[in-house]
């Protein structure tokens, strides 16, 4: 029994794909969802991050246990729209696929949760407890929306949390963190014909980088025991088992220097240069450790000429891989997905769970699970399989009922 027809479910997704939320303007989706919830007498509230960015929270039921369902409303930039086969901000159905920016990451998952909430309420299927939907702004960059909801206490009383990021047949119980670490070197600019009276910032930065590589390489030699196991994820993505050595490396700390800047013209000694790193912290080497690791190298080289800035700082999140939420989703999904395709793993990427749960001292059940092939995220001609989108609505409904009934 459903409240919405298949055609209506696809149209609801089409409606929010048309709302252009490229790293901004989530307020438009909030207003759309508020009207939709009002139509079905579901209480909801819009919480603004700023004028154009906002979250919306909606809730059905009452009392405990409390299951939170979450998805983000922002999408990444569509890039040059001329490179798309179909318009990115218009849902196009072709050969069983629904094309459009955000269909996979993650308006498909978000709308599946919205429909889940409405249909459970309309069909009076909630056995006990509360379902709280949290639609967030700004996940793709700084997680501003999730931070706001956490600060306001919307996660303080939850027993379980489903984040409907595109995971295909994967169910994730934990993930690494993500840090942006920028190291800036300062010097003295002079004409390049007299470099000896200046101070080349690039030289100082290179000294830092050489020390960083040496110490990071030494650290990785001892990074062999991990709480997070990402091997099942990689087996699914590449279609075969990865070596124990690769699994060890992938499950541990990773740090990549991804941006370098220095100098403005060839005949001047640069007075500033910078390196930016993306670091993926793990429980064994957490965010505090990473900050100290960078700062210690800066102190060794020259703290008067080098500085550290951390504009993005998301912690790794862990939960019980055998929690009631994980086992419930796995059992329900097995009726819709081939049993041998379903796997439970830790995730190398970060989600709003970092801001929602932090180090998860309260042991909230966490499941990152949603429709869409994760490899389609951020791609030109992004799409979600229509059947997957529709099936996952049913999975979310059944799993929510079972979890609240048995928790």
UniProtKB/Swiss-Prot annotation:
Matches recorded under Gene3D superfamilies: 3.30.70.360, Zn peptidases
PROSITE patterns documented for this protein: ARGE_DAPE_CPG2_1, ARGE_DAPE_CPG2_2
Keyword Hydrolase: yes
One biological process term in Gene Ontology: diaminopimelate biosynthetic process
Keywords for the protein's UniProt record, in alphabetical order: Amino-acid biosynthesis, Cobalt, Diaminopimelate biosynthesis, Hydrolase, Lysine biosynthesis, Metal-binding, Zinc
Binding of Zn(2+) 2, residues: 105, 140, 378
Cofactor(s) needed by this chain: Zn(2+); Co(2+)
Enzyme Commission number(s) from the entry: 3.5.1.18
Catalytic activity: N-succinyl-(2S,6S)-2,6-diaminopimelate + H2O = (2S,6S)-2,6-diaminopimelate + succinate
Cofactor note: Binds 2 Zn(2+) or Co(2+) ions per subunit.
Active site location: 74, 139
Sample GO molecular function, one term: succinyl-diaminopimelate desuccinylase activity
Annotated disulfide bonds: none
Pathway noted in the entry: Amino-acid biosynthesis; L-lysine biosynthesis via DAP pathway; LL-2,6-diaminopimelate from (S)-tetrahydrodipicolinate (succinylase route): step 3/3
Positions bound to Zn(2+) 1: 72, 105, 165
Family to which this protein belongs: Belongs to the peptidase M20A family.
Record protein name field: Probable succinyl-diaminopimelate desuccinylase
Organism this protein belongs to: Staphylococcus aureus (strain N315)
């Amino acid at each position: 029994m459903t409240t919405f027809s298949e055609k209506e479910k696809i149209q609801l997704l089409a409606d929010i794909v048309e709302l252009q939320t490229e790293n901004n303007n989530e307020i438009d989706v909030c207003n759309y969802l508020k009207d939709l919830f009002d139509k079905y007498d579901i209480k909801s509230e819009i919480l603004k991050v700023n004028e154009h960015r906002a979250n919306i929270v909606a809730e059905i039921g009452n009392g405990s246990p409390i299951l939170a369902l979450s998805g983000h409303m922002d999408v990444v930039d569509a890039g040059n729209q001329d490179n798309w086969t179909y318009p990115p901000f218009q849902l196009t159905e072709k050969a069983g696929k629904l094309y459009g920016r955000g269909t996979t990451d993650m308006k498909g998952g978000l709308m599946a949760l919205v429909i889940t909430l409405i249909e459970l309420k309309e069909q009076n299927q909630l056995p006990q407890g509360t379902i709280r939907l949290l639609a967030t702004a700004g996940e793709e960059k700084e997680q501003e929306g999730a931070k706001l909801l956490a600060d306001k206490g919307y996660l303080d009383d939850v027993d379980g949390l489903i984040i409907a990021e595109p995971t295909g047949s994967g169910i994730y119980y934990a993930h690494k963190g993500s840090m942006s670490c920028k190291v800036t070197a300062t010097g003295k600019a002079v004409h390049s014909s007299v470099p000896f009276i200046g101070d080349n910032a690039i030289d100082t930065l290179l000294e830092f980088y050489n020390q960083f590589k040496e110490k990071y390489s030494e650290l990785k030699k001892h990074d062999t025991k991990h709480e997070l196991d990402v091997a099942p994820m990689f087996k699914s993505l590449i279609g075969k088992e990865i070596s124990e050595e690769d699994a060890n490396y992938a499950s541990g700390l990773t740090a990549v220097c991804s941006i370098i800047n220095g100098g403005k013209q060839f005949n001047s000694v640069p007075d500033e240069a910078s390196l930016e790193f993306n670091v993926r912290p793990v429980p064994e080497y957490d965010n505090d450790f990473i900050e100290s690791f960078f700062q210690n190298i800066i102190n060794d080289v020259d703290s008067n000429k080098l500085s550290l800035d951390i504009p993005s700082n998301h912690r790794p999140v862990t939960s019980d891989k055998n929690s009631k939420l994980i086992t419930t989703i796995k059992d329900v999904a097995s009726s819709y997905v081939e049993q041998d395709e379903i796997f439970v793993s830790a995730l190398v990427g970060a989600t709003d769970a970092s801001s929602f749960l932090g180090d998860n001292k309260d042991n909230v059940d966490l499941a990152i699970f949603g429709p869409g092939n994760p490899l389609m995220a951020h791609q030109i001609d992004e799409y979600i399989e229509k059947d997957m989108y529709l099936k996952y609505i049913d999975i979310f409904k059944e799993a929510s009922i079972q979890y609240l009934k048995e928790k």
